[in-house]
Amino acid sequence: TNGRINFPADYKGKWVILFSHPADFTPVCTSEFMTFAARQQEFSDLNCEIIGLSIDGLFSHIAWLRAIEKLQYNGIKNVKPTFPVIDDVSMNVARKYGMIQPGQSLTQAVRAVFFIDPAGIVRAMIYYPLSLGRNFDELKRVIMALKTADEFKVATPADWKPGMPVILGAPQTTATAAERVTKGGEGCQDWYFCTKELSQDSIMKQILNK
């Protein structure tokens, strides 16, 4: 919908969320597109671009995006999706990325989300059934967690959000494990489970616009 895309070359140096939706002019997909449009700047601030895809045609995409501008949902109104939506009538891209799931539909892409890093590597994937809309706080959290892990060489624990402790990598040798037990420290409960405090400010300074 924004012209021809050369992927991933056009997005070199940026994070990308590539997501598929089952069909234009469907209610759950409409709510998702409105939410993506309303929150697009939040992802842009994280140096993350958004690309949509379905196996509908270009003219269907254009008509639907124009119709969305007139709708209201969950306090969102007057939104204009500006991210590109791929016309994949041939299902070529959808098949390559595993977006067609026989258990769901042979003629619709499932709700898939691919998190792609600046090197063009797929770092995470989430699949949703046709009936379930995506959680956009979680999509943003995944991007922030991946970037935090890369910038600080750490891992992020369950339910992590910026400002919460992060996980230090597990020791790779018995000597390192023994050293951790000996040194201990406030964040180490055992040789394999050590956390580290990282303030929200320090994290956001490192991951915004990078």
Provide a role label for each language-model segment.
Residues T1-K210:
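Chalcogenol-based redox active-site neighborhoods
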